[in-house]
Each structure stands twice: as C-alpha cells, then as structure tokens.
Amino acid sequence: MSEIQSVIAREVIDSRGNPTVEAEVTTLSGTGRAAVPSGASTGEHEAVELRDGDKKRFLGKGVLTAVKNIETVLGPAVLGMDALDQAELDKVLIQADGSPNKSKLGANAILAVSMAAARAAADTVDLPLWRYLGGAAARVLPTPLMNILNGGVHADNGLEIQEFMIVPYGAESFAEALRTGAEIFHTLRGLLKKDGMVTAVGDEGGFAPRLPSNRAALEYVVRAIEAAGHRPGEDVGVALDSALSEFYDAKTERYTFDKQQKTREEIVAIYDELAKAFPIVSIEDGVAENDEKGWRLLTERLGKKVQLVGDDLFVTNPARLAKGIEDGLANAILIKLNQIGTVTETLECIRQAAEGGYRSIISHRSGETEDTFIADLAVATNAGQIKTGSASRSDRVAKYNQLLRISYALGDGQVFAGRAPFRRPGAKRSS
C-alpha cells in the first residue's frame, strides 16, 4: 500500500515571485505534495539550491533544471520504494546526487521529493503529518518568534539587524500567544503611522520603516508591547536575528553596525548592553558564520543569559552542529529544511541538538510558499519554538493557521512551550 507509484514535479512561484520546486509523490493509497522555500540571507555552507541561470527567463532564477532532475533522475530512483521508510528513501536521493552539498541535482529538487514522500506516507497510513513524523509523543505547540520589524537584506531601510521579533511566552496557549502577537503587530502599525513612518511590510510580513538605529527599532518594539497592554519581559520577550554575516568583512575582521565599523569585541559589548536595556531572550547569528573568535566571545559573555542561535553557523548540518557543540559555540540551532535538503537529515540534526543540550527553532525562509510542513515538523519534534514571520502575508499566516488546527486536534493533550525554551542557567526568570 505504501509503494511509490509516481513522482511528478513542477515549477511554481514563491512569496517573492521567484520560481521554486514543487513535487508530488503518490503511493498505492496516498498522495503528498510539497513546495520548497528559498532564503535571501544564505549561509555559505548550505546545501546548494539549483537555479537555471537563463537571464531571459525569471532573470536567471528559473528551476526547470531542478524539475527535470526530479523527472529523470530522482523520481525514477525512488519508484517502487516504500514511502514509509523515509531514511532509506532519503539515502537513495542523496546517493543519486552524489555531491557533498547536493549541488549536482539541487537541494531544492531533493527536498521537494523528500517532503512530498513524507506527506504521501502520512496520507497512506491516514495520519496527519505531525503525528506520522512525531508519533504518540508529539504534543508541544511551539512558542512563536514573530518577526514584526524587518531590516538587513529583508528590507531596504538602513538597519543591519534583519529581524526584530516578539516572543509571547507568557500566554497560556498557542492560540493566546498568536493573538498577543497579532495585537502587538497591529499596535506597532498604529505607532509607526502616527509617527509618519512607512507601514509597508518586508519579505516576512514585518514592517520596514527607515529608522536611525537598531536601538530605535527595539524601542518601537517595546513601545508596541506596552501599548498593546502587555508587559515587556513578563508577558512578551524580544528576539533578534542579526544575520551579521551579511555585514562582516573577513579581511578587516570588522562589522558594519549602525552604519559604523565595529570590532567583534564592540559588537558583543553592544549585545550585552542591549540585553540589559531590553527584554532580549534570543539572538540569532549575532556574529558572522566564520568568525569563530566572535562566537566564542559572544557565547562566553551571554551564553548563560540569552539563547544564542546558530543559523548560518550550523546550516542545519549535523557535522557542523557536532563541531559547534564540541567547541562550545552558541547554545541553540535554527532548523531550516532546505539548508540540508532532506527530512531525515533535518530530524537527525534536531535529535543531535537535543542530545548536546541545544535548543532547536524550526524556521521558515524569507522566500516562502503556502506549504505548512514546518508547522507539522515543529509539533512532531516538540521543538518548542517556531520562526515563521509576522501576523501578515498568507505565506506566513498559513503556518500559524496549521498550528491552530493541530492545537484543536490535540485538545487537552497539548502542551504550550511558553517560557520553557528560554530558561537558561544563570538567567533571571520572570516571576
């Protein structure tokens, strides 16, 4: 019943209007479809996303080559396989590519088939994806890290920090956390509009006003939390995705921050100061992916007080994560399916993080689709945290709505992660 009968692929459009890959896998009694996302700020160690490069078509960003690779190589490779054996299926996909970074056939092609096969398997056994992947233990609804103010490469507004997020960890349930986030989002819109700021949104649904400094952005976020009737640090925390690899000069070992050149020591000192002035509970990619000295310094200074997330540092790669754990860099990992390219490797990375005492945050990409796989993955793995944008743009809201559906399905059996992921040894806890 779970034998794969067909694999088809097509080119579809993502939330930025760029092509991406969608695959559909059919077994004797089930079907699964999946579309892969794409990032704007990408780590240099990520699995390779294959683009056509034909400037006459989608400005070179077409994915017909990746689609063809599914139709002629990857699809035939898994025909007749048992969709219920995800590990073996992903092994075959990886072997078909044969390169260390999935550059031959494309991580976007491989992941589309991997995700679609998982969905087909779940459909075959008549289970929701989150239950199929997570089993009976899947019951934790994640605390959302909601990106309400954008900067960096996600917005042309002069801010280096890429995401200013709110973390409604004081809520009693996921539904209440989502409501809290939506209220703060709309309140921020009102504050910005009142001050004559632009209220257009960036790639991930957050506002992208032109502000004088990163600190000014944080001040707006805290004002919005308070104006919405919530207590900063008690009901709602703040998280940052600095994505500072985009603003690092490896030759001079200097960062651009607030339009000034800074050393790694100065950058870490800035974070230390901001963490004292604002209720910051998480900092992602606070220094560049290849700045090991910076990561050591940041972890030594703030690792016992704040969640330090490696995104570009680890790129959802078990080998890079293992080295990071051994070296004591960061204390959490961002999980992006398309950084590594298969469901199995993603699950392995989450398991490895847990064994090493690192938290996992399931994440979207700036170029998204209506696909809700990451919502199911967050619950399946009891990760406890999810990053999937603001309370706007249907490509972001789709994930939140799927989490609401899962919440209703779990009923009294669900647990909301709340503050738990952010409690660290040495950190001051909210009363």
Swiss-Prot record:
Reactions catalysed, as given in the entry: (2R)-2-phosphoglycerate = phosphoenolpyruvate + H2O
Keywords attached to this entry: Cytoplasm, Glycolysis, Lyase, Magnesium, Metal-binding, Secreted
EC number(s) recorded for this UniProt protein: 4.2.1.11
Pathway: Carbohydrate degradation; glycolysis; pyruvate from D-glyceraldehyde 3-phosphate: step 4/5
One GO term (biological process): glycolytic process
The protein's required cofactors: Mg(2+)
Protein residues bound to Mg(2+): 241, 284, 311
Active site feature: 204 (proton donor), 336 (proton acceptor)
GO cellular component, one term: phosphopyruvate hydratase complex
Cofactor note: Binds a second Mg(2+) ion via substrate during catalysis.
Compartments (UniProt record): Cytoplasm; Secreted; Cell surface
Positions with a binding annotation for (2R)-2-phosphoglycerate: 162, 336, 365-366, 387
Molecular functions per Gene Ontology: magnesium ion binding; phosphopyruvate hydratase activity
HAMAP family: Enolase (MF_00318)
Family label: Belongs to the enolase family.
Its job: Catalyzes the reversible conversion of 2-phosphoglycerate (2-PG) into phosphoenolpyruvate (PEP). It is essential for the degradation of carbohydrates via glycolysis.
NCBIfam families according to UniProt: eno
This protein's name: Enolase
Gene responsible for this protein: eno
